[in-house]
Each structure stands twice: as structure tokens, then as C-alpha cells.
């Protein structure tokens, strides 16, 4: 087991989606509808995510190998009130696999919720929306059989954290030892099925800022490695990447990256990339081969650059904003020789081939938005070879 110390930056999630923090703020703030309106003409090119020319539409054309970039998507899975059959979830996973192959993805991360009663609670549990270990295994096997690099990632749901500043990153259990014991009991069955499904990575924690560096992680990770033979990782929040150290006893550290860039909707891809690099440079300049963008995205709406992960706002749709952001992030990943990027997100029960209903859907949804799909396909089909396999940078 290797102990890595890295500073990582990302957004946190309210419920099952990311919500942004303004730099230096203790509370999440919504971006007001005050950004200059884009005057750029709308690009109406109809670009669908079509399968790559492979012999089998359910097979990744070039499966991931160590040293290659991870080009992926975060698939968020909440069980519906009316539980779907095992046959349904396998068919649904196949539908997503086919769509992701059409985008050129070689990786997928399956995220799912678990629950806490309050900010100070020591008890963690499954809920009605938590898929069972057996059902998770079925879905992971569909993606593995299709040739994807697979990740399993439990995320603490924040629905019970009603305080004004309540989020997973500032929980304070009354007894940390009891909290870790409860968490071990919760995740162990998922570690075992992840191992059975030959999953590449298990994310042992996501955005748990207040618990990072706690002595409880050592025994938990040691236990996890007895049940799971793949990589054990941790995904940290974006602001930590630039302002603090994270010491976690894991194989790898990822970052959920939603760096705010204070520019107009008409900003060029180069300007957006510079905004990202300015944030990254606060930690380190040059190549970042140890860093994986475990989660990134932005709303397809005006003013989104100011708060990329704002799930709740539904300002005027501007797909160009989202597409240009994706292009800029991909450019930075390649220029800094990072490990790859996973886009947030697609909901498991959604049809990725259907455009989102902008009256109700999150602006962060990208599936079914032609310009963004085109940007993803261009990113995933680039000639970027990846960070390489040097042990010092893998």
C-alpha cells in the first residue's frame, strides 16, 4: 500500500449532483443571471453519438491499458421507486455501453448513493435508492464484458444535511471510530462484488474533506485491499487542490474539478483553458501525470463559467458554453499530461439518446446535446497517448 499526498480540487454534490462553492466562501452560492449574453451564432449542427466502426457495437474499439488516458463518463445510479427487474438493468447498462462506445469512451465510473442521518451521525446505511451489491455486480459485468475500464464509486447523499452549510465535506461524527466501523460494514459487500466483476478501481471516499487524513482510513483501506484486488482510490474536492494537502493511504487520488472562471459566455476555448491552468498552477506548474479528473462538467446555460457545477440554476440554455468548456478541459488534460477525465454525468435510468427536457432536467446533463457530444467525441478520439506507465507517474 502506497501513501500518496496530493492537493486536489473539486466540487461537492448536493443530493446526487455537484453544487459549486465560490472561492473563499463557506457557503455555496448560486450565480446570478448577470453574465454577458452570448452574441455568438448558435451552432445547429446535428451531431449524434454514433457507434465507432467496430465489428461489435457493444465492444470498445481500443480497450484501456495502463498508461493510456482514461476517457470516461460518470454514470449515476439511483434505484427508482418501482424497482426495475434484473433483466431491465442489464439492458439499460447495454444501452449506456453502446452510447459511450459511440462517444469513443474507454472508461466508465458507476456512482451510487449511501446515506447518513445527520452531520454528526456515526451511522451510514443503504437507502431505498441504493442499488444492492448483487445488482451493481450485474451492471459492472456488462461494462467489463464490453471492454470498458470500470470504477465503482459510492457517494454520500446529502439530503439529510439540512443545515445551511451542511454537505459531505464538513460532517463531524460524534465518534469517528464508530463512523469508520459503520462505513466498513457498508462498503465491504460492494468491494467484494467489484472484485468479482474485475473492476479496475474502487473509490473508497469522495469529497469527505473533514475526515481526510484521519487515522481511521488506514485500517479501512487495509481491509478494503483484502476484499478488492484492484486500485483503491480517493476523489477529493476541487478547492483542496489549490489550498491544502491531502494525505490518504490509497493507490491513487482523483479530483472532482469545477474551477470557476470569471469570463463572459463568448470567451474562447483558449481563455477557458488559461482559467483552468491558472487554478492548477496554484498547486504545481507543468505536467500533472498523477492527476485524474475524476469528475468534471458544466451547465449548458448562460453564465455557467462563473460556477461550473451549479446544478440548481436553470438559466437560458446555451449549449455552446458547455461544449467549449468540455473542449477546454480536454485541452488542459492533454497539455498537462493528466490521466484523463470523466464527465458528470448520465443518470442510469435516463435514455442517453434523448435530448434532455430543459424544463426539468439539470443544465449539467450533456447526453442528447449535439454540440457537447461532438466536443466529447473530438476529445476522446484525439491522438493523446496518455501519461505513460512510468511507476513514478502512474
Model segments located where?
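Aromatic-rich peripheral "rim/lid" segments of glycoside hydrolase catalytic domains that contact
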Residues: 6, 11, 15-41, 46-67, ...
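Short, acidic/polar
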Residues: 84-100, 180-193, 237-246, 323-331
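Glycoside hydrolase catalytic-domain groove-lining segments
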Residues: 132-133, 138, 146-149, 153, ...
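Active-site neighborhood of glycoside hydrolase catalytic domains
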Residues: 186, 201, 211-235
Amino acid at each position: 500500500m502506497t501513501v500518496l499526498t496530493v492537493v486536489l480540487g473539486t466540487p461537492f454534490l448536493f443530493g446526487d449532483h455537484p453544487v459549486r462553492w465560490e472561492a473563499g466562501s463557506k457557503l455555496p452560492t448560486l450565480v446570478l443571471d448577470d453574465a454577458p449574453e452570448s452574441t455568438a451564432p448558435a451552432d445547429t449542427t446535428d451531431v449524434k453519438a454514433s457507434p465507432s466502426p467496430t465489428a461489435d457495437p457493444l465492444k470498445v474499439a481500443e480497450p484501456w491499458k495502463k498508461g493510456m488516458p482514461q476517457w470516461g463518463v460518470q454514470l449515476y445510479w439511483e434505484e427508482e421507486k418501482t424497482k426495475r427487474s434484473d433483466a431491465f438493468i442489464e439492458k439499460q447498462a447495454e444501452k449506456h455501453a453502446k452510447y459511450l462506445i459511440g462517444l469513443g469512451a474507454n472508461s466508465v465510473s458507476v456512482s451510487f448513493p449511501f446515506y447518513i442521518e445527520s452531520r454528526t451521525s456515526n451511522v451510514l446505511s443503504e437507502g431505498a435508492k441504493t442499488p444492492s451489491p448483487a445488482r451493481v455486480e450485474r451492471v459492472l459485468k456488462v461494462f467489463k464484458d464490453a471492454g470498458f475500464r470500470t470504477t465503482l464509486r459510492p457517494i454520500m447523499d446529502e439530503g439529510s444535511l439540512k443545515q445551511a452549510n451542511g454537505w459531505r465535506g464538513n460532517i463531524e461524527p460524534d465518534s469517528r471510530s464508530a463512523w469508520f466501523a459503520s462505513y466498513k460494514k457498508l462498503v465491504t459487500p460492494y468491494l467484494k462484488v467489484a472484485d468479482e466483476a474485475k473492476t479496475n478501481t474502487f473509490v473508497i471516499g469522495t469529497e469527505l474533506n473533514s475526515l481526510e487524513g484521519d487515522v481511521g482510513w488506514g485500517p479501512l483501506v487495509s481491509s478494503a485491499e483484502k476484499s478488492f484486488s484492484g486500485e483503491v482510490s480517493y476523489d477529493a474536492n476541487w478547492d483542496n487542490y489549490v489550498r491544502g494537502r491531502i494525505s490518504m493511504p490509497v493507490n491513487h487520488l482523483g479530483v472532482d474539478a469545477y474551477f470557476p472562471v470569471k469570463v463572459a459566455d463568448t470567451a474562447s476555448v483558449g481563455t477557458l483553458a488559461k482559467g483552468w491552468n491558472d487554478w492548477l498552477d496554484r498547486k504545481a506548474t507543468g505536467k500533472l501525470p498523477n492527476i485524474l479528473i475524476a469528475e468534471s462538467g458544466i451547465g449548458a446555460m448562460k453564465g455557467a463559467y462563473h460556477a461550473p457545477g451549479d446544478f440548481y440554476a436553470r438559466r437560458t440554455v446555451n449549449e455552446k458554453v458547455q461544449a467549449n468548456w468540455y473542449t477546454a478541459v480536454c485541452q488542459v488534460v492533454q497539455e498537462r499530461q493528466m490521466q484523463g477525465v470523466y464527465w458528470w454525468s448520465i443518470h442510469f435510468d435516463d435514455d442517453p439518446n434523448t435530448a434532455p427536457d430543459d424544463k426539468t432536467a439539470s443544465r449539467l446533463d450533456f447526453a442528447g446535446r449535439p454540440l457537447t457530444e461532438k466536443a466529447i467525441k473530438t476529445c476522446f478520439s484525439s491522438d493523446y497517448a496518455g501519461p505513460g506507465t512510468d511507476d513514478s507517474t502512474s
